[in-house]
Amino acid sequence: MLMHHDPLLPGAFSEELWQQVSKRLLAKVIEEFAYERVFGVVEEKPGHYRIDIDELQYRFKAKRYVFDNLSVDPASLFKRHGNSDAPLHDPLAFCAEVLPKLGVKPMTVAHFIKELGNTLVSDAHIAARASKTGAELAELDDICMEGETTGHPWVTVSKGRIGLGYSDYLAFTPENRTPTEVLWLGVSKERASFIAEETLTNEGLVREAVGVSRFESFCAKLAARGGSVDTHYMMPVHPWQWDHMIVPHFAADIAAGHIVFLGKGDDLYLPQQSVRTLSNISHPEKSTLKLCMTILNTAVYRGIPGKRALTAAPLTTWLDQLLARDQFLSEECGLVLLGERAGMHYVHPQFSTIEGAPYQFNEMLGCMWRDSLSAHLKSGETGLPLAALLHAGTDGKPVVQALAEKSGMTVSEWTARLFDVVIPPVFHLLAKHGLAFSAHGQNATLILKNGRPERLALRDFIDDVIVCDQAFPESATLPEEVRAVLLCLPADFLIHFIQTTLFICVFRYMSVLLDQRSGLPEHAFWGLARSSILAYQKRFPEMASRFATFDLFGDEYPRLCLNRVRLFTHGYADDDERPVPDFQGMVDNPLVAFDKRSNAA
C-alpha cells in the first residue's frame, strides 16, 4: 500500500489565513477593475462606495487618490442581500458572479478564475511564510528580495502561471525559494543559432557557467553521440521546460542527435519574479540565465522569440557604447545597464513552417545570458528591485521607511533622494537619446549604500526598449538588425510608456503606501517628484526642445489597462502575436494636478 505524506505547506490552507488573503485579493480586484473602468463605482458619501451591476450591489470603504485609483479597505467589503449586508471575501465567487454580467465570454471567465485561483494559492503561501519585519526586509539583497515580492501590483492575476502544477509551483517559483539546478543540452548548429558580443563564445560562456571539469564531461557526452563543439552549441534549459516541452515536442530531434542531453550544472539558482529568469546563488557574480518556460503568466507565454534572442547582444554592445559616451549617465548617475551578452534560439522543424502558428510554439527553446547585478556593485553597495519599495514587513513598517531610518534620513528626504536617483537617468535616456526603457518594479533595481539610494540599474532591453520614430542623431548608429526588432513609435507614446511603467506601475502604489503608513501625503510625494524633474531640466537648458517633445507636464495621459486585455480584448486566445495593451480614457498627471487644484482653490 502506498503511503503519502501531506504535500501542502502547513498554514497556507488554514481557514483564517485563506479568508485574510482572499479579502486582500478581492480588494485588489475591485481597485484595479474600478481603475480600468471594468465597472463603475458610485461614491455614496466621503470614503464610502457602491458598485451596481444589474441586481447586484456591493459596498465598501476606500480612499480615492490622484490617478482616480481607490485604496479599498478589505474588511469593509459587503454584498447587499435584501435589506442587510453580508461580508464579502471570495474573489473567485465575485468574478464568477460579476464578469458574465459585464459581457465577459464564458470561456474567458472560467480561465480567468483559474488564473486568479493560482494567484490566490500563491498569496496564501507568501502570507504563511511571511516572517520579516520592515527593517529585516531592508537588509536583503536583490536575489533574496525576489522571494518576498508579490508580482506586478496592477495585474490581478499576477501569479497565474498556467501550466505549473502544485509540485512545480513549490519547486520553481520565487516565493518558495527552492534552489534549482539548470539542465544543459547540446544543440545542433544546423537548427540552433548563437549570437554574442564579439569577445564572447558559446564555449567560454558555458565554461564560466559550469566550470572546466563539468564542461569537459559535457564534451565527452557530446562525443558519445557523435557530436562536438564544432557541430553543437551548448544551451541551458529550465528543468520544467525539458520535462513538459522539449522531450514531448522535440523527441525526433533528440532521437536524431540534434539535441543531446548533457546533464546538470553544479551551481544552484533561484528564480526571479518572472519565474523563468534564474539568478546564480552559488556564484552571484555569474550571469543570470533567461530561459524559456511555456507557461502563461501576466499576459503572455514565457518563451523567447528567436529574433529577440539573436539581437540582444548587438543591442547591449550599442547601449554600452552609448553609456560610455554620455558622462551624465555614466559618471554622474552611475547608471548600470545589465547587458544581455548572448542569446540562442533553436528552430523547431515543423512549428516554424506553419504560417500563423501561435507564438508559443516557436518560442520553446532559447536562452539569454544577462549580467548579474552583483558583478556591477561597488564595495558596500546592495540592490533592491523597485518592487520592494511597495512592500511592508510583518510589523506593518514599509521597506521605504526602514531604509530611511537605516540611512538617517526622514521618509521625505529619502523619497526625494530616490527620485533624484531614478527619474533623471530614465528621462535622460528618453530626452537625449530617444529611448524609452521599461522601468517598472521588476526591471529597475535601486542600488543603495547604508540604506541610501545611490544608483539605478536597468534590464530587459531587447524585450522592452522602444525607439522614438524621430530621427535623433544620438540613435542614428543603432544597428539596423536591432532597429528592425525594437518598436519604433511617436514621442507621445514613449513619454506615456515611461509615465505608465514608472509613475503608474510603481509610484502610484508607493505613494498610497507612504500616505497610509509613513505620514508622507500624496501631494507631498508628487511634489518631490516634480522638483526632481525640474532640477534635471534646469541642468540641461540646451535640451529645451527635447523636453517640449517629451513633455512630462501635460495635464493628463492615457489610462493603460492590462486586466481589460485579459477580460475583453484578447482573453485567452492562442494567437501568432503577443497581445497589446488597452487604453480607457485619461488620468490626471500628478506632476501638475496638485498645483492646479491649489490654484483653483
UniProtKB/Swiss-Prot annotation:
GO terms for molecular function: acid-amino acid ligase activity. Keywords: Plasmid. GO terms for biological process: rhizobactin 1021 biosynthetic process; siderophore biosynthetic process. Pathway: Siderophore biosynthesis; rhizobactin biosynthesis. Belongs to the IucA/IucC family. This is Rhizobactin siderophore biosynthesis protein RhbF.
